[in-house]
């Protein structure tokens, strides 16, 4: 990129006009359904414990904080939105900036736009249907198909992800030429994620969006464990044309279980030599008060716009990608 061109937007003005129209359409979608739009902080004194997420950290040094206060840029508005649910806000959505100190590339930018919404009294399947409705409206695409995580592995890799041991998973990885990574990986979920990324994702969502649901219980994150099969979590992801678009949960409401999961994440972080992260005690305290049974989902807006416009990279649909920020 020449120095004289670096001031220019990464997206064309016509693309930015189309993006604005899509943002307005998303807001109409939720307004028509009586879902409240909210705004929550971009910074917090706590952050995610997930070993696969890397948040940005900053420091507040204003009056009364001469020693400084550690703050984290939010990787998602989830925790604050759940506190609003506990406070009685009802169904809510948010279009906001989120930040992850990770990849930069075709589908990634450290700063990105997230659409996140929560539906009290919705189970996972009802929320999946609403996500499907939104995708059809914005993308004018066919209705989605669905398959379980187990079905996806059996169909494309001929292995049962719920029962296979690490040796069996490494054997499948070898067939995908992934032995250089898999042979030294001891975490079973990381092996599963490796196989899912390289063996399943390229095969799904080609002609229509595809929901993959019932991820292993060990990958529940903030989702409930299924009451029908304790091996799986009430969690889903959505893929279309090679892109992961959304990640949703039938949300965990048990404060003690959530605390234990956060602590387990930090133990995994310590075992990998990663820094342990402060647990969001405000979220735990809110869950103790009682969050309504609900389902929620986070959707990458930049990726959605990218698909709607037929763009090849995120940079084509955001005003200034990080290399021009």
UniProtKB/Swiss-Prot annotation:
SUPFAM superfamilies: Class II aaRS and biotin synthetases. The keyword Ribosomal protein does not apply. Keywords: ATP-binding, Ligase, Nucleotide-binding. This is Elongation factor P--(R)-beta-lysine ligase. Its EC number is 6.3.2.-. With EpmB is involved in the beta-lysylation step of the post-translational modification of translation elongation factor P (EF-P) on 'Lys-34'. Catalyzes the ATP-dependent activation of (R)-beta-lysine produced by EpmB, forming a lysyl-adenylate, from which the beta-lysyl moiety is then transferred to the epsilon-amino group of EF-P 'Lys-34'. One of its GO terms (cellular component) is cytosol. Homodimer. Gene3D superfamilies: Bira Bifunctional Protein, Domain 2. Belongs to the class-II aminoacyl-tRNA synthetase family. EpmA subfamily. ATP binds at residues 100-102, 109, 244-245, 300. It comes from the Bacteria. One of its GO terms (biological process) is lysyl-tRNA aminoacylation. Signal peptide: none annotated. Substrate binds at residues 76-78, 118, 251. InterPro entries: Aa-tRNA-synt_II, aa-tRNA-synth_II, aa-tRNA-synth_II/BPL/LPL, EpmA, Lys-tRNA-synth_II_C. PROSITE patterns: AA_TRNA_LIGASE_II. It catalyses: D-beta-lysine + L-lysyl-[protein] + ATP = N(6)-((3R)-3,6-diaminohexanoyl)-L-lysyl-[protein] + AMP + diphosphate + H(+). One of its GO terms (molecular function) is acid-ammonia (or amide) ligase activity.
